[in-house]
Amino acid sequence: MKKKVALHNLGCKVNSYELEAMQQLLEQAGYEIVPFEPGADVYVINTCTVTNIADRKSRQMLHKAKKMNPDAVVVATGCYVQTDEGKLETDEAVDLVLGNNQKKNIVEVLAEFEKEHQRQAHIIKINQTKEYEELEISRTAEHVRAYIKVQDGCNQFCTYCIIPYARGRVRSREKENILNEVHKLAKAGYKEVVLTGIHLSSYGVDFPEDKKETLLSLIQAVNEVEGIQRIRLGSLEPGIVTEEFAKELSSMPKVCPHFHLSLQSGCDTTLERMNRRYRSAEYKARCELLRKYFGNPALTTDVIVGFPMETEEDFQASYDFVKDIHFYETHIFKYSRRHGTKAAAMSGQLTEAEKAVRSDKMLELHQKRAAEYETSLLGKTLEVLLEEEVEIDGKAYYLGHSREYVKVAVLKTEEYGVNDIPAVKVEKTLQPHILQGEEIQVL
């Protein structure tokens, strides 16, 4: 009888990719994949440590798994595992601990546990490794859009961030391996790929001179893959957006006009304390370059509120800057004090109440700007990748995303279906953050 394994992911798209790769390795080894419910023989939890809340959720899911089946093997892997300083190795809810850069060994580690029945920890010194852990997927849970991990690690060491300690230094994936995966996904019917990594803008910086690659050269190569109609990019550092970069991207019709430029704060004083490598004027110039070459792209970002020593004036400067840029989406994070980072030792730590007030104010601005951007698309013809069938107000629709990553619904007909990309004239707002359009033609 096949062993049953249930998997659960916490955290970013890189984590999601790695969990899907582990799932496919387990399937190939003869395991049956089942929902994360009671009855599994093995539970694999891919943990996250980006905030204190992520740490707590990681611990909760591990304990939940053991409660669902006390006889099951519970495997903890991912970023929380890498940074918890061995605490999980003594946690009775956890049988196996698998650090980052060890996920490819999931099948062998489980087989070894079956023989020994002894709790084990497989963790390397992540900051010393130069090896990129080669994982691959042949399909994804999304069915129409595939996230592809091209890079791991980060060399930036922003003062608030624990991730370099969890992921190690920059390690880039060989371009040939990336392209092989893209070709396989294209043959499997995927029309959109999203290039993602821990610090995507650093792709290729660790390669030797004789095989130098950059993120731009990688995108150019992916652009040549037949069958792929859309290329989307994960989070970018502002510094990568030069005139050449923006111009070259705009010359590739597959590249979507949707860019996530990490900001964190619009206040120069705070940016300096954060050890960010740019200031607000430079960031604004990068946004203007993207608008110069893409017209009305969807610009999205991350902002931290309540960073140590952030005064009311500092917050207001950040708020005013975000307001001025007109982002489509702003992901707002209340500063989370991460043990081992420089910011954790800074004076001037703000209360949770102060952070909440600032977060709420920034969230109101985000909601207003999101609605404004969606309104700017009314009357336009957008290409929409249809992803699922939904029912809204008693009517059947296909729901998908435009190239700008805005949700658009079209009435269900026999002329097209999931994974088609019709040209849609957007007519109105159907629901908050869902536009409605009328199909013109299937591309």
PLM regions and their residue ranges:
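Conserved strand-turn element in the central/C-terminal portion of the radical SAM core barrel
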Residues: 161-168, 230-239, 265-276, 290, ...
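Proteins enriched for Cys/Gly/acidic motifs involved in redox and nucleic-acid/cofactor modification
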Residues: 1-204, 214, 244, 249, ...
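Residues at or immediately flanking beta-strands
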Residues: 4, 192, 230-232, 258-260, ...
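Short, electropositive alpha-helical surface patch
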Residues: 208-220, 243-257, 310-328, 352-357, ...
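Radical SAM/AdoMet-radical enzyme domain recognition
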Residues: 187, 216-217, 224-230, 241-301
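Conserved, mostly hydrophobic/aromatic
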Residues: 158, 178, 195, 233, ...
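Flexible glycine-/small-residue-rich
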Residues: 9, 197, 235, 263-265, ...
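Terminal RNA-binding accessory module
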Residues: 345-443
